[in-house]
Amino acid sequence: MGKEKLILAYSGGLDTSVAIAWLKKDYDVIAVCMDVGEGKDLDFIHDKALTIGAIESYILDVKDEFAEHFVLPALQAHAMYEQKYPLVSALSRPIIAQKLVEMAHQTGATTIAHGCTGKGNDQVRFEVAIAALDPELKVIAPVREWKWHREEEITFAKANGVPIPADLDNPYSIDQNLWGRANECGVLENPWNQAPEEAFGITKSPEEAPDCAEYIDITFQNGKPIAINNQEMTLSDLILSLNEIAGKHGIGRIDHVENRLVGIKSREIYECPAAMVLLAAHKEIEDLTLVREVSHFKPILENELSNLIYNALWFSPATKAIIAYVKETQKVVNGTTKVKLYKGSAQVVARHSSNSLYDENLATYTAADSFDQDAAVGFIKLWGLPTQVNAQVNKG
């Protein structure tokens, strides 16, 4: 009788490479690597998995699906965990889990393995998502079970013919996709240490950024960015292009001490140039086009959605319901913003929309004013009536 098939979420790094060598004793390991826009050498990763002992190796290009079905709902909801973090890693985990489950069904695998440790958020995100999609699948986490130190991993790797990554002495732990780059560990673990320039990978230092501002126009249709400077492109290409444009101006650097799902605080360095520009630009079109009641209520749901995504509940009915509400609000979010990029700052300096609720004739203080100021007297009387009655009844 043959071995059981196992799907491994494979990154090409030391942890998951060692996992192949360890797991192949008991399983037929099928390595699956998802391209979410991190810019890795995917051909090398594919071949490396086979060299170590995987029976099959797959590279899945999911950039477009990731952008359309995971990043876009987060953008439209201005999803920022603790009002600071655009959920870079948290957004990619659900689609990775989804593809792992699909590959398990396609290949007849009964088990899924991931390379997360026992103290991070991602173990929860993967396992909760997999359970939501197929509760019958078994999930194992070799790195969490081993509790090995890096030196022990290296010893095992050398003894079992696992190639040692060239950047193994890099003190940082980095995760990247098209929505941004996350960095932790090393000197960053002390929150008093300023992040050194070497900790950044996709943004220039604002001090070294160009001395001249750059202006770009971003066009939205139904809340989705569709063009930069009138050049239409797919959402994934637009985000990747904007990462380069805004990154060279030092935009999107975030230094955040966050509350992890597992109960500890963690200091993270994020680089999210495209995300920060798009979030600012999208909000400005909403400010033009949404009625006041939606503008005031939507942020409440945005905060809740940010927490749900961060806390591993992408496939929760609550998440689905909030995303549906947000999608309904986006029907009128059409227009163009002009964004000034300059030394770490992305400032929206102009905006227009065919659905704009801004009426210059109502807002102006010039002779063109069409606002009926005489109506203010009755409005104030009725608006303030509850306050007036309360004051009369409860004097002092």
From Swiss-Prot:
InterPro entries: Arginosuc_syn_C (IPR048268), Arginosuc_syn_N (IPR048267), Arginosuc_synth (IPR001518), Arginosuc_synth_CS (IPR018223), Arginosuc_synth_type_1_subfam (IPR023434), AS_cat/multimer_dom_body (IPR024074), Rossmann-like_a/b/a_fold (IPR014729)
Pathway participation: Amino-acid biosynthesis; L-arginine biosynthesis; L-arginine from L-ornithine and carbamoyl phosphate: step 2/3
Gene Ontology MF terms in the entry: argininosuccinate synthase activity; ATP binding
PROSITE patterns the UniProt entry points to: ARGININOSUCCIN_SYN_1, ARGININOSUCCIN_SYN_2
Gene Ontology biological process terms in this record: argininosuccinate metabolic process; L-arginine biosynthetic process; urea cycle
Subcellular location field: Cytoplasm
Family: Belongs to the argininosuccinate synthase family. Type 1 subfamily.
Assembly with partners or alone: Homotetramer.
HAMAP family: Arg_succ_synth_type1
Protein name: Argininosuccinate synthase
